[in-house]
Amino acid sequence: MNAIKETRFELPGQTGFYKGKVRDVYYVADKLVVVASDRISAFDVVLPRAIPFKGQVLNQIAAKMLAQTADVVPNWILSVPDPSVSIGIKCEPFKVEMVIRGYLAGHAAREYKAGKRTLCGVALPEELKENDKLPAPIITPTTKADEGHDEDISREDLLARGIVSEADYIQLEKYTQALFQRGTELAEKQGLILVDTKYEFGKVGDKIYLIDEIHTPDSSRYFYIDGYAERQAKGEAQKQLSKEFVRQWLIENGFQGKEGQNVPVMTDEIVSSISERYIELYEKVIGESFKKPEESNPEERILKNILKAL
């Protein structure tokens, strides 16, 4: 199976094109046609080899999760004409990512270990251990940097800097809490804990929409419910479902995206094992078996399905 490294379509009515780290975005009238390529990024670097089926895994998880939360928050999706494509409403994105955390993990745990007891203006209790459940989920927004890394920001700073209006931010907070609640319920049905995740929103006129992907292993962290309490009691690492395994492989091979470091050689075996892990993620998060497309030329299939949908 060929991986989808990139697409370069000329679509009827196309007014623009944007190549993201892993997505190819086509602007067609008031719509976005988003192709989830098989490119993979870690440490803000796109790795040299694409991972077969990765784009399909993320696109299909996001599409299913958007469908399962559409009663909670209106979202951008209009159709999913191909396993690797979503077509939706073109929104003006807010320049903030709404990160919500139910547990002390990842970035929050690193900050806590360094002695910080407030994160984005939110006070954290003493005596927490890494991966402990927080008393209640906390929202820790980050600014969306046009270049470079995103930055943590407090609600007060967001409003003071005029990044978002107070009325809109109140709505974003409500939507974020409601989505996390639904995401937590969906995860529990699959024997998983939704640890933390991020949501992005955009606006058309006065209406706010949920945009981009949600509850995927690239935008979220999941733990397994089974054995969680025992591992916490023993101080053991939690078994997690995310793309952390890719980062771990890179770190073990001397790469963390720092200057002067080279990306390690990705053998066919490594590419194949990452692909299998993504498929496993899909099946665990969604609870259905993954269907591989049979075509030898995925770009041809994708273009045909986009043209039919437009």
UniProtKB/Swiss-Prot annotation:
Q: Where is the signal peptide?
A: none
The record's listing under PROSITE patterns reads: SAICAR_SYNTHETASE_2 (PS01058)
Record's InterPro entries?
Answer: SAICAR_synt/ADE2_N, SAICAR_synthetase_CS
Record pathway: Purine metabolism; IMP biosynthesis via de novo pathway; 5-amino-1-(5-phospho-D-ribosyl)imidazole-4-carboxamide from 5-amino-1-(5-phospho-D-ribosyl)imidazole-4-carboxylate: step 1/2
Q: What Gene Ontology terms for biological process does this UniProt record contain?
A: 'de novo' IMP biosynthetic process
Please state what class of enzyme this protein is. ligase
Q: Name one Pfam family in it.
A: SAICAR_synt
List, alphabetically, the Gene3D superfamilies matched: ATP-grasp fold, B domain, Phosphorylase Kinase, domain 1
* Single annotated GO MF: ATP binding
Q: Which domain of life is it from?
A: Bacteria
CDD domains in the cross-refs: SAICAR_synt_Sc
Catalytic activity, as annotated: 5-amino-1-(5-phospho-D-ribosyl)imidazole-4-carboxylate + L-aspartate + ATP = (2S)-2-[5-amino-1-(5-phospho-beta-D-ribosyl)imidazole-4-carboxamido]succinate + ADP + phosphate + 2 H(+)
Give the keywords, sorted. Answer: ATP-binding, Ligase, Nucleotide-binding, Purine biosynthesis
Q: This chain belongs to which protein, by name? A: Phosphoribosylaminoimidazole-succinocarboxamide synthase
Organism, scientific name: Cytophaga hutchinsonii (strain ATCC 33406 / DSM 1761 / CIP 103989 / NBRC 15051 / NCIMB 9469 / D465)
